[in-house]
Structures are given as C-alpha cells and as structure tokens.
Amino acid sequence: LLKRFDLFSVVRDDLNYNGGNMKSWEIWGREDEPANSSWDGWTKLITCNSFKPSGKPVGENTDEDNAYIGKGEKFDFPSGIPEVRYIRIKVLDSWSGQGYVQFSEFTFYKSE
C-alpha cells in the first residue's frame, strides 16, 4: 500500500511558487492496467495543495518559501486507500493559473 509521496517542484528563483508548478492536484490509482484514457475504474486517493509558508502572492517569495520548496513537499496518503499499481495525476491548478504543468519529481513510498 502507498504510504506517502514527496513532490519536488521545479526550483528556480523565477519559478518558485509560480509558472506551471502545481498548486492543487489529485492523485488517482488503480490495480489493473487501464484499457484507454477514460477515468472509468480509477479511484481518487488524495487531494493535495502546495503550501507556501509566507502566504505572499505569486511572484513574492521569502527565504523561508524558497527553502521549503527546495526540500520538496511531503504528503501522507490517508489510511484505507486501496492497493494500486498505476498512478494518475489530475492537476486542478498551478501557481500561475496557466494551462501547463511542470515538476521535477514525484517519489512514492509504500507501507513496510
């Protein structure tokens, strides 16, 4: 079972909490291989929101903001989610609100 994941955003002074870095998203999963791109058979596992320590508007970052995003954000899956083999990410919003998404890495961890 999935336990948690880390999101590493694209880290650059002009892109921290900006651009296509994800602000809110959902992670969906399923055990069997999907036959097509339909959402049928997928289960929502978690809804996530990126956290900006200062709460300042887009384009205004503090040293604390930059340090926080540089370490990667950590998220715990809720208990009771089903076992999954396939992951799908549905982006709800980016920090700039533009129609593209960027990230450096997702790292998923399973329960021991």
What label would you give each PLM region?
Residues 1-40, 69-112:
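Aromatic, loop-rich ligand-recognition surfaces of beta-strand-rich domains
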Residues 43-76:
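Extracellular carbohydrate recognition and processing domains
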